[in-house]
Curated annotation (Swiss-Prot):
PANTHER family: ATP-DEPENDENT HELICASE_NUCLEASE SUBUNIT A, UVRD / RECB / PCRA DNA HELICASE FAMILY MEMBER. ATP binds at residues 60-67. It comes from Streptococcus pyogenes serotype M12 (strain MGAS2096). HAMAP family: AddA. Belongs to the helicase family. AddA subfamily. Its cofactor is Mg(2+). Residues 524-810 form the UvrD-like helicase C-terminal domain. GO terms for biological process: double-strand break repair via homologous recombination. Residues 39-495 form the UvrD-like helicase ATP-binding domain. GO terms for molecular function: 3'-5' DNA helicase activity; 3'-5' exonuclease activity; ATP binding; ATP hydrolysis activity; double-stranded DNA binding. This is ATP-dependent helicase/nuclease subunit A. NCBIfam families: addA_Gpos (TIGR02785).
Amino acid sequence: MLFNINEKGEPLVISFAPFLSPEAIKHLQENERCSDQSQKRTAQQIEAIYTSGQNILVSASAGSGKTFVMVERILDKILRGVSIDRLFISTFTVKAATELRERIENKLYSQIAQTTDFQMKVYLTEQLQSLGQADIGTMDAFAQKVVSRYGYSIGISSQFRIMQDKAEQDVLKQEVFSKLFSEFMNQKEAPVFRALVKNFSGNCKDTSAFRELVYTCYSFSQSTENPKIWLQENFLSAAKTYQRLEDIPDHDIELLLLAMQDTANQLRDVTDMEDYGQLTKAGSRSAKYTKHLTIIEKLSDWVRDFKCLYGKAGLDRLIRDVTGLIPSGNDVTVSKVKYPVFKTLHQKLKQFRHLETILMYQKDCFPLLEQLQDFVLAFSEAYLAVKIQESAFEFSDITHFAIKILEENTDIRQSYQQHYHEVMVDEYQDNNHMQERLLTLLSNGHNRFMVGDIKQSIYRFRQADPQIFNQKFRDYQKKTEQGKVILLKENFRSQSEVLNVSNAVFSHLMDESVGDVLYDEQHQLIAGSHAQTVPYLDRRAQLLLYNSDKDDGNAPSDSEGISFSEVTIVAKEIIKLHNDKGVPFEDITLLVSSRTRNDIISHTFNQYGIPIVTDGGQQNYLKSVEVMVMLDTLRTINNPRNDYALVALLRSPMFAFDEDDLARIALQKDNELDKDCLYDKIQRAVIGRGAHPELIHDTLLGKLNIFLKTLKSWRRYAKLGSLYDLIWKIFNDRFYFDFVASQAKAEQAQANLYALALRANQFEKSGYKGLYCFIKMIDKVLETQNDLADVEVAAPKQAVNLMTIHKSKGLQFPYVFILNCDKRFSMTDIHKSFILNRQHGIGIKYLADIKVLLGETTLNSVKVSMETLPYQLNKQELRLATLSEQMRLLYVAMTRAEKKVYFIGKASKSKSQDITDPKKLGKLLPLALREQLLTFQDWLLAIADVFSTEDLYFDVRFIEDSDLTQESVGRLQTPQLLNPDDLKDNRQSETIARALDMLEAVSQLNANYEAAIHLPTVRTPSQLKAAYEPLLEPIGVDIIEKSSRSLSDFTLPHFSKKVKVEASHIGSALHQLMQVLPLSKPINQQTLLDALREIDSNEEVKTALDLKKIESFFCDTSLGQFFQTYQKHLYREAPFAILKVDPISQEEYVLRGIIDAYFLFDDHIVLVDYKTDKYKQPIELKKRYQQQLELYAEALTQTYKLPVTKRYLVLMGGGKPEIVEV
């Protein structure tokens, strides 16, 4: 009953219907079954909507209407007197919460319209009004409410903010880490700590690897119920437990013995084959058969009598015995067919090899792990203290605060438990243990309603644990008093062609070992309506593979993304769908595994005129041109003496100074000053007091005056106004916001600039003030190699969608293409130097010194990286968890399709057969095979091969190059909307039509030649942008002989009294010296001094050259000696020119440069380049100049038709010469 007040102020009593009993629910199910409704609710849906009074876990397969069930259940609760504000409803995303709220709102409006009872109308209207304040949202949002309201109980201010920007978090983390690292390096246990750092970083100076370890441990701990307790009690769990052979888990031993027995059984099956050849011609046993029988008997005996023959203590001996018994190869060949009998056993033996040695040294790493535990605990506390001081927290902090409030305050916890009639959770399979703890605290123990599908758990990278769902599933099935499991199997989304192929694939692929759930009848998809079962032969699933048999090896590898040929296959199929079946582009979606390296898809689709909307890529907001210009503008306003920022601002479209202008300004220095910044030179140029005032002409003087006046006004405004207003003042004063509107990707550029102003505003609202602080924050973000989130702009609606599988979850599309099926799963995590596990804690690779073990006496140490027992244990679990999630990703991708699913990949047709022997397998692919295969494509091909006698509901087709010609792919048929010859259609005069035609022609011409407009005729390698290089196509190249050089370098005269030696002058002098140095003579100081006299440089530069370093290069390095040995093959300072083609306009331009040195042999070339840059690590220069050397190599190869086999950088900017092979 519920009391409301009527218009006279009198109480109105509303009598609500009671909740349905199990018998009433069965009666309702029967009525629904017998009804003549076109769309009936299933019996399981009815059970999930109306069952009450206990915990309920709804396992909802893809497309089974779980959102419909949740909305109907919520509405039923409301109609039975449960106010909407007494329901806790958790969703995985804010978007899902908004959609759910809208659906409930529509249902309430509909119910109000249908209800004739005035009292019920008033009640439902109140529910509608309360909907906005109801607890429908993410767990993060709810935790914020709890902390805002009760944070005082644990000492947390209600006036906190959320640090959503990872860059801001990293800046704070870096500050805390650096301070803590210094403290630990100076503590009593510093030697142990240094050993810890060296174990992961190699040396104490480079802390990046150790820092990453600490950050990962911290982040992992935050997903647990209580990070501090986990770090104290679980972090070293495996390290403490697994120290002897006897500590190895029984499960691992069982798997080894099972592999041994399976090997014996498979070998017996092979020996029983008719063509095996058990007997010789004489009728006696063949030697091969005798050997195999011995293996079978011994393996079976050792498995049966393991405990008495070996036991855990003798495990190392068993491994040696088995290794010595079986052959080193994997296969047994019968009639030219290879059977991988021993493959699985070899993999298991590898896991257990060298156990005694590992355990001997493993104990030495325990003190290191204790130091790591102390450091991570200290880091967690210090980082939290900084966040408390700033009153800025991460989402995980807020959730832990909420948990702490509920755990430590019984009255608060009970008030929530009494308030909520039911605790409802959507996407339950993606919860982590922290969220599970919060839900447990809110529930009274028997009022939880959880909806999810373990087959769609794909957020392990967010520490989601599908075992939470799995454990509930098992517990509720075994102990019905704890809760009830309801299965929603009917799919209302997809046609039978999609459902059948999904069932066929996963019934052969997914079980508890890989996938975390057995894909049996209770998990298989069933069509929810008759219309879905109508067959369409042309919608049968397709596995389309580009045949790579003729691949020249230049195509991208799996790690580099999808190939051009694969994208062309997709384009061909889309053109066919669009032209032949009239399928609109928006009905087609491409699914990829990651957001990166998808540019080739957009590029290829543009070629074929197929519109596409992408899901974005890597974050490059701060690196966009328009944002970089604005940041340099702000840096200049803050400090005009920052030459780099000032030059960028002057060269920007806002002021448009060119190279000649800057050169004239640069000469206006003060002769009495050694160091003179560009800003001072500008001021002197304006008043005519520079060293060369005659170079400043009237036009340049006018530009300088405008610049100084504008900069002065900006600097004055920066002291008075907000950052937001300053940025808009810059936009308006120099029309920069309008300017970018005329450039390519105008909408994106304007959105980026607008976002910069908003972010500056948000920055100041966060408590930080001033231009200096904002610039410092941005620079720290860039220093930590982070970026800010990209800005989204409105996308066209009639276009093909490209998105990640993760992004597609919860969505549906008529036609789905799953791309890059040949891409290998990322196994990076299982090869790291450490692996974390919630139960076992950390396992590490230990860098052990085995000098004593080897009896080595000459070397100081012999270091070997060992996988400790905890590491091996975590590694095996992580590998299976990774494969399981990849399997679930494939399930999510396939079940997005409504009508048809395509798989796109690349494989060698000649090598794709013979995956395994099909005759001895059950329903599933063998576990060893599923573990071994590491791509979607391999799984599908294995299923197609092994179960070839079944109808698997998908076809495998190899696509040849001949199928991908322009004629074969075809062109889009685009209907002409207006007939240009029909004036009734056009409704415009001839004059206007001609004008529009002319404008269109000019626009097209500019578009075609845009790159040519902006590209100069001649460029140098250092000027060529790295991002543009892959698009350019070399068509001609020539190495210019030294005698053909017609232009000599022109050097401006020195007007100053004292010449400053620039780094570039030293570099030029070194190159000249290396060019004239006579290599036929011994290289010593005298030889170098003689050569030095021949070069064209002033005495200050010659004095600055480090001749000892040059002598050391020739005398102490193998490359220097190579110069002298093969001097007849050496060419020095060779100019080159490459003719390049702009990919858009097809305009040609010349790229020129000079190659420092190369050796030309009969069959190959060796390339050498000298660098005088200062550096900390050689890898910095290697990355910086890699593309430049690739360009030089390209020039040499084009000229001589020989490969460049070696490329060297000679680094002269350090303490001694270093040689780096690129």
